[in-house]
Amino acid sequence: MTIRKVLNKYWGWTFLIVPLILQVVFFYFPMFQGAFYSFTNWTGLTYNFDFVGINNYKILMTDGKFMKAIGFTLVLTLALIVGEIVLGIIIARALNAKIKGKTFFRAWFFFPAVLSGLTVSLIFKQVFNYGLPAVGSALGIKFLETSMLGTANGAVIASIFVLLWQGVAMPIILFLSGLQSIPSEIVEAAAIDGADSKQTFWSVELPYLLPSISMVFIMALKAGLTAFDQIFALTGGGPNNSTTSLGLLVYNYAFKSNQYGYANAIALILFIIIGIVSVLQIKLSKKFEV
């Protein structure tokens, strides 16, 4: 076989070499390196460390901060999944109706998606700390006179609200696209058969929205389990670690306490959780595809 024939046969593979090298160097190598360090007491400050086996994982089981972070992360993730799906469908159905100015409203609801999560959190931090208390004082509304971020329950609610306010923008577009993909003949046939809005949704619209729901589920799951920058800017994990997510906990142990080995153990647990849930969700979603 001549050189020209070899090049012609394998030329396409040469375009994959650079991406594969980059993926190995910047994804797979750090991933396996992090998994290795999770079995050490590495501080990140020197090259000296001791192999401690599964000791870091044993400590996790009795770490109050870790358990608290697990609880908040699960609450946040569940709220985002339910909120983005339910609100996304409701708003998408409203925007799909024949209303005046729907182009404006579609752009309005999508606007939060183009903003930086950090910027949104910093803006809402000022609103919760100064804006709402000022309004509460002016109107004599007692529960608004103090910052929501000053109490554990208030900070949790504020965190969910901010992430949901920005996170629901993309699901609205996805659900709107799904609704517009429904053949008009099917909708008209349902109307002729006497189906009301509720019956049309459950029997006609929902089956076409299932692929979008599956995608939104994964997006919300990832956003909840990996939440970091918004929480970091909005509450910093406080008060009293009530809004510390797993991502923020990894950051605190790694960069504030210099416990890189322990932080990698938490990160690996988070990676495994996301992987398992994602695989199960993808398999289940295939059973409901139209």
Swiss-Prot record:
It is found in: Cell membrane. It is a multi-pass membrane protein. GO terms for cellular component: plasma membrane. CDD domains: TM_PBP2 (cd06261). It comes from the Bacteria. Disulfide bonds: none annotated. InterPro entries: ABC_transporter_permease, MetI-like, MetI-like_sf. Keywords: Cell membrane, Membrane, Sugar transport, Transmembrane, Transmembrane helix, Transport. GO terms for biological process: transmembrane transport. Residues 70-281 form the ABC transmembrane type-1 domain. The chain crosses the membrane at residues 12-32, 72-92, 104-124, 156-176, 201-221, 231-253, 260-280. Involved in a binding protein-dependent transport system responsible for the uptake of melibiose, raffinose and isomaltotriose. Belongs to the binding-protein-dependent transport system permease family. MalFG subfamily. This is Multiple sugar-binding transport system permease protein MsmF. It comes from Streptococcus mutans serotype c (strain ATCC 700610 / UA159).
